[in-house]
């Protein structure tokens, strides 16, 4: 059985970690380097840094944060936010990142996935997908012909990919996009449910399972973690390979080690 990974996520704004709900209402959660050291000591398998403001003038801040973190933490570090070119990949990797996460730039210029994977290797290229349920009122709608429709407890829906930090819908079906990024050379998918983000009500298992089933890539489930049962569900029912979480760790509701011990009780292999 493949070992499942537990990955704390640090959303970084102007050099500080922040956390919100449904991508809004951001609260300060601490210093990224200090939190990274804590999660490393608690047994995190990897870390994800997402520079959520990522405008050009903030780029130097994230590079500095990555450098300082990489000097003190020795687990794989994925960095994303505002990365648009192969040169951006190179700068962040040189600063100490192990993988680069791209979202908006992947949608806008899909060939970046191919180019980066050929230069740096597929293991370096993580495609992040911010996904929202799009509920259907008319199942006969002509516009649904190229969409994968799911029956959920709240009605029929398809899953839409969003860009620019969840601010803009693309009309792209998440399942079809996942297949495309795999073909282009992505090595992993970081899959965030915008509906579940920050709610602590559990991961969107319909979404996670559907993406897992339709690609051969490792899937990191993200959005909605509130307790260890949610993580177990993401692994068992959602078929995820890794689980990302933020709030429950940042606000000391549990530790990475606490989560792993509970997960192991459910016969799921984790690194303790």
From Swiss-Prot:
It catalyses: 5-[(5-phospho-1-deoxy-D-ribulos-1-ylimino)methylamino]-1-(5-phospho-beta-D-ribosyl)imidazole-4-carboxamide + L-glutamine = D-erythro-1-(imidazol-4-yl)glycerol 3-phosphate + 5-amino-1-(5-phospho-beta-D-ribosyl)imidazole-4-carboxamide + L-glutamate + H(+). GO terms for biological process: L-histidine biosynthetic process. CDD domains: HisF (cd04731). Its main location: cytoplasm. Belongs to the HisA/HisF family. Pfam families: His_biosynth. This is Imidazole glycerol phosphate synthase subunit HisF. It comes from Methanococcus maripaludis (strain C5 / ATCC BAA-1333). HAMAP family: HisF. GO terms for molecular function: imidazoleglycerol-phosphate synthase activity; lyase activity. Its EC number is 4.3.2.10. One of its GO terms (cellular component) is cytoplasm. IGPS catalyzes the conversion of PRFAR and glutamine to IGP, AICAR and glutamate. The HisF subunit catalyzes the cyclization activity that produces IGP and AICAR from PRFAR using the ammonia provided by the HisH subunit. Keywords: Amino-acid biosynthesis, Cytoplasm, Histidine biosynthesis, Lyase. Pathway: Amino-acid biosynthesis; L-histidine biosynthesis; L-histidine from 5-phospho-alpha-D-ribose 1-diphosphate: step 5/9. It comes from the Archaea. The active site is at residues 11, 130. Heterodimer of HisH and HisF. It is found in: Cytoplasm. Coiled coil: none annotated.
């Amino acid at each position: 059985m493949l070992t499942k990974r537990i990955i704390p996520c640090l959303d970084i704004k102007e050099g500080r970690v922040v956390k919100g709900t449904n991508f809004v209402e951001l609260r300060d959660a601490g210093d990224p380097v200090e939190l990274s050291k804590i999660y490393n000591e608690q047994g995190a398998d990897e870390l994800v840094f997402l520079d959520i403001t990522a405008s050009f003038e903030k780029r130097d801040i994230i590079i500095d944060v990555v450098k300082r973190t990489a000097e003190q933490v020795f687990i794989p570090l994925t960095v994303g936010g505002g990365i648009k070119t192969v040169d951006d990949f190179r700068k962040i990797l040189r600063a100490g990142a192990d993988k680069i996460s791209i979202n908006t730039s992947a949608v806008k210029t899909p060939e970046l996935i191919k180019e980066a994977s050929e230069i740096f290797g597929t293991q370096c290229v993580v495609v992040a997908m911010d996904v929202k349920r799009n509920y259907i009122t008319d199942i006969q709608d002509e516009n649904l012909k190229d969409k994968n429709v799911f029956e959920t407890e709240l009605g029929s829906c398809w899953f839409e990919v969003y860009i620019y930090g969840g601010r803009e819908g693309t009309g792209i079906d998440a399942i079809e996009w996942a297949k495309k990024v795999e073909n282009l050379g992505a090595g992993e998918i970081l899959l965030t449910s915008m509906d579940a983000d920050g709610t602590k009500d559990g991961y969107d298992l319909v979404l996670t399972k559907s993406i897992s089933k339709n690609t051969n890539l490792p899937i990191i489930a993200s959005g909605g973690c509130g307790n260890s049962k949610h993580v177990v569900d993401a692994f068992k029912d959602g078929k995820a390979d890794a689980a990302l979480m933020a709030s429950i760790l940042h606000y000391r509701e549990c530790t990475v080690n606490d989560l792993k011990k509970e997960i192991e009780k459910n016969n799921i292999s984790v690194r303790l």
